[in-house]
Every structure is written in structure tokens, then in C-alpha cells.
Design a protein with these regions (language model features):
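N-terminal secretory signal peptides that target proteins for export/translocation
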Residues: 1-4
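Bacterial N-terminal signal peptides
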Residues: 6-19
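Sec/Tat signal peptide C-region and signal peptidase I cleavage site
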Residues: 18-26
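Conserved beta-alpha junction segments in alpha/beta enzyme cores
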Residues: 25-258, 262-282, 295, 302-319
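Anionic-ligand-binding alpha/beta catalytic cores of soluble enzymes and soluble regulatory domains
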Residues: 287
Length: 319
């Protein structure tokens, strides 16, 4: 039976040139502005949690706060891009569309100028209404999820505006490292694939890092990525998982800096070992160490102009 997974959203932002030295690009290609902001998005109510079908009750408090963070970039021609990272399972289409409309009207930000990236933590709230759990026919979980989604939209709208308001001259640099805790989770067996560690399967353990420095040379923001499920935990408490701990460690090492985590293509990769807070912290420390390694080497200067693209596609699949 053929189905369509409609409106898969993607935003692609890329820089047209990486230069090893400033002499490789004209001065206006290096005339960046950047602004960064952060806000707590931890639910205040005991909402149901997203990610694991076996859960049978709402969250029972928090282990860590959940955050949304925004990095606004502007090149010499005035082209803007706002990167928003979220400690959430994903980004519902309705949330994306509502923010597009509001940011377009208030901030003159086009759809291709807004990049939303969720860490895919399985210890965050379930606010996707079409996936909300049912409690013996009681619609309260759905209504609570809708209310959280409305609150979240408002906070993200303000967050984006704050990052844009903080735009000031900046310098961008790229470097990378590796972290080894992600492992392929598709284990072939005589009966088909099962969700288990597969050390022989394909894996992406790269850690790309974008550093943002002010005119004074001080580090203002660090954007780093990793392709791995945020599934170190399966508790009934809010937790940003290894990605959240990694951001905390980086920010502690660089006071005044905002660290942003971007999830890569980690659908077939899990963190191993897992199941405890200590393991999530261990993976977070490993990822933070990789970021520090990348920051310790001379970066490639990132030059403009800035280009981005946005589109929606239909994906055919059979079941």
C-alpha cells in the first residue's frame, strides 16, 4: 500500500566559500553581523512525553531545563538567516508555518531565512496534536499539548526578534572534530533488522563546529552538530539528554557564550551505552570535548555571501 509523507520541511543554508586566510576573500565577504539569544521552554505542567510508545503517564518533573536558542546572521548585502535550535522531539508543520508568517510580517524574514532544528530528545513534551496520547477518551492531554504549543510559539517569536535585535559585527570560523559514542542501531538478523547495537554498520561521528566571535575577539556563540538520537534516557522527567549536557559543558568552559546543538542525520544511530543520567552526562562530556578540540585549532574563515533555500517535498513510501 502506497502512502505519502507530505510536506517534509527542510531549510538549507550554506556559505559559498571557506577561506584559509583573510586574503582569499574581498573585505565585504567578511562583513558579518551576528546576534544570539536563549530562552527556557521547559513545560510548567505535567505533560505527556514524546518519543517512546511504551510511556503510560505524564512527566513527573524535570532533571534539566529545556531550551530554545537562536543565532541570527546577516551578510554584507543584508541577507539574513536565523538558526533556531530546540530541545524538543521535532518541529510540527503548524508551528513552522505560524512562525514563518509572524516573522515575515514583523521582522521581514523570508521562509528561507528561518531554520528550525530540534535535538530529537525523547525526554521532552509531546505537543504534536496528531500524536498526543489518549487517556481513556479524555482529551485533556491533547488540550494541554495544544496550550504548550501556543506558549512555545510565542516564546520562539520573541526569541527570534531578540537575536535579530542583537545583530552586531562578528567573525565566523569553521572547524570540526569527532565523537565516538554514536553507533549504528540497525542489526541484521535472519528474521530481519532489529533495533540493537551494530558496530559494523555505517556511522557518522563527525562534529562540525561554527564559532562566532565579536569584534573584540571574544567567543559569542558556538554552533555544533552530531548525528545521533538523543535517547540516552527513558525516564519520566524533562531532560535535554546528551545534547543538553554538552551545551552546558561548553558554556561553562566559555562564560558568556551561547552553545547551540544541531541534530544531524542520526536516524539509524543511537548513543551507547545508555539508560542512566550518568551515561547521558558522559556522552555530553564526550561531545563537549570534541567541540573543545575543534575550537583549539585554527578555523577556516567563513565568508559570504549567505545563501539559503527552503522547500517542501512529498515522500512516497510503501507499507
Amino acid at each position: 500500500m502506497k502512502h505519502h509523507l507530505c510536506s517534509v520541511l527542510f531549510t538549507v543554508a550554506f556559505f559559498t566559500a571557506f577561506a584559509a586566510g583573510s586574503q582569499c576573500a574581498p573585505p565585504d565577504a567578511r562583513a558579518w553581523k551576528a546576534g544570539v539569544a536563549s530562552v527556557v521552554i521547559t513545560p510548567e505542567k505535567a505533560l505527556w512525553m514524546a518519543g517512546y510508545a511504551s510511556r503510560n503517564k505524564p512527566a513527573e518533573g524535570k532533571e534539566t531545563d529545556l531550551h530554545a536558542k537562536a543565532l541570527a546572521l546577516e551578510d554584507a548585502q543584508g541577507t539574513r538567516l536565523v538558526v533556531v535550535t530546540l530541545d524538543l522531539i521535532g518541529v510540527p508543520r503548524a508551528l513552522r508555518k505560524n512562525l514563518e508568517k509572524r516573522c515575515g510580517e514583523a521582522y521581514k524574514l523570508p521562509p528561507e531565512g528561518l531554520l528550525l532544528n530540534a535535538s530529537h530528545t525523547h525526554s521532552g513534551p509531546e505537543f504534536r496534536v496528531d500524536r498526543a496520547p489518549w487517556d481513556d477518551g479524555n482529551l485533556k492531554p491533547t488540550r494541554d499539548g495544544e496550550a504548550y504549543g501556543e506558549l512555545l510559539e510565542g516564546r520562539l517569536f520573541q526569541l527570534i526578534g531578540e537575536a535579530l535585535d542583537k545583530l552586531s559585527p562578528a567573525k565566523l570560523g569553521y572547524s570540526h572534530a569527532r565523537a565516538g559514542f554514536a553507533m549504528n542501531r540497525r542489526l541484521p538478523t535472519p528474521k530481519g533488522y532489529q533495533n540493537s547495537p551494530n558496530p559494523d554498520g555505517p556511522v557518522d561521528q563527525s562534529v562540525p563546529v561554527l564559532r562566532v566571535e565579536g569584534e573584540d575577539g571574544k567567543l559569542r556563540a558556538v554552533v555544533f552538530g552530531y548525528a545521533c538520537h538523543n535517547t540516552s534516557l527513558a525516564l519520566y522527567k524533562w531532560n535535554a539528554d546528551y545534547a543538553g549536557y554538552a551545551q552546558e559543558f561548553v558554556q561553562a568552559e566559555h562564560p558568556g557564550t551561547v552553545a547551540l546543538f544541531m541534530m544531524g542525520c542520526g536516524g539509524d544511530q543511537n548513543p551507547y551505552p545508555r539508560k542512566t543520567v550518568e551515561m547521558a552526562q558522559q556522552h555530553g562530556r564526550a561531545l563537549a570535548n570534541a567541540v573543545e578540540t575543534a575550537l583549539s585549532v585554527a578555523p577556516r574563515e567563513v565568508n559570504g555571501p549567505l545563501r539559503s533555500a527552503y522547500g517542501e517535498v512529498d515522500l512516497d513510501y510503501d507499507v
